[in-house]
């Protein structure tokens, strides 16, 4: 039986590594004054009239939505409705960012324009975030098992135990990160996630804490593949996640491990 959530052509490496996907994208401003519980943001959505999963993305400590805007547009162009948010203050801590990601999902479903609301399948939601936004992503995933996917990017959180998470989670770390070093953040976060869930750990080679703030082929490719696989239940994308990218010398990926198959 055909998957009703499949969107777009059969995927290839070239399609996933390109700066934009197959869908034309429109955008809509979410005013800080109209946003309840977060600092406003920008919604990117496919122009094609259909229903799509929805994704909320938080920036990191001291960051604004501009630091993750490229991800909003990139992911929307593959068939998702995406909001990149400003936080209430740029100094908000991870657990505050979790609440704001949740508020942003609610905003898209209930308060955005009809063009946005009519395109969202509210049963298929996901969250992403950079740095403290990645910590917020983990926190919300631990609180909302109904989420379909979570992607923390070079995440930072004081809590190291995420064994309560039941959401398919892709953690992306960076080997040269000195702000949230993988040895004390991304790796122990991944290791603490239960082996019973679909999870993966991708460590970028030669990359710093701020790798998610500029267009990155690897982050874009594997974030889209993860969202497609778990928000859209689209098994055409499993080929990119299992066995996943090769790691080692002279590659763009330092390490990749997962609970494949999924």
UniProtKB/Swiss-Prot annotation:
Gene Ontology cellular-component terms listed: extracellular region; periplasmic space
Family: Belongs to the AB hydrolase superfamily.
Protein name: Cutinase 2
Keyword Disulfide bond: yes
Compartment(s): Secreted; Periplasm
Origin organism lineage: Bacteria, Bacillati, Actinomycetota, Actinomycetes, Streptosporangiales
A Pfam family assignment: PETase
Gene field: cut2
Organism: Thermobifida cellulosilytica
Disulfide partners: 242-260
